[in-house]
Design a protein with these regions (language model features):
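Conserved S-adenosyl-L-methionine
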Residues: 47-51
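Conserved SAM-binding motif I beta-strand of class I
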Residues: 67-72
Length: 185
């Protein structure tokens, strides 16, 4: 957390009003994915629109044998992620300064995302980046979403599995927070 406080004073990586709830709103929220899914050795996960490194950094710590590529279109955020990963000696994280549509050279077992775009767009960007996986992790798009998702899911024409995070973590913050999983078929 101290690393993020220091970087946030220079570059607005995380909303300043959110820093007092850093663990709950960012770390624990990201780790809700680990409460639902396991990622295996040598699986490759893309964190699309990683922002300050969430959910990618907490997941990479939790799954040290899984490879994570954290991508964002804002270069200053990628700079922060590189510094954080180096400071905590996180060897299974690489970064890419890129928009989702511009990633053409990789195939991943899983794409994860948090607070980036509507499901329709996330699936459109993610699907070409996914490969059929033989690993134990989720093979498809896993995203963290909030609020009433009825319209967003309908407009996406996806049929994701949906888990209520509040059933995993009792904190008030997690009411109306969900994990969505759209499998690659």
């Amino acid at each position: 957390q101290q690393l993020y406080i220091e970087w946030n004073s220079k570059i607005n990586v995380i909303s300043r009003k959110d820093m007092e709830n850093f663990y709950l709103h960012h770390v624990l929220h990201s780790l809700s994915i680990a409460a639902q899914f396991q990622f295996g050795k040598d699986e490759e996960v893309l964190d699309l629109g990683t922002g300050g490194g969430f959910p990618g950094i907490p997941l990479a710590i939790f799954f040290p044998e899984t490879k994570f590529l954290l991508a964002d279109s804002v270069n200053k955020k990628i700079t922060v992620i590189k510094e954080v990963a180096a400071a905590i000696d996180l060897k299974n994280v690489s970064t890419r300064h890129s928009r989702a549509e511009d990633i053409k050279d990789g195939k991943f077992d899983t794409v994860v995302s948090r607070a980036v775009a509507p499901l329709k767009d996330l699936w459109q960007w993610s699907r070409p980046l996914l490969r059929k996986s033989k690993g134990e992790g989720p093979n498809g798009l896993v995203c963290l979403k909030g609020g009433d998702l009825t319209l967003e899911i309908a407009e996406s024409q996806c049929k994701p599995f949906v888990w209520d995070i509040h059933s995993m973590f009792a904190e008030e913050y997690f009411k109306e927070k969900y994990i969505l999983f759209q499998p690659l078929k």
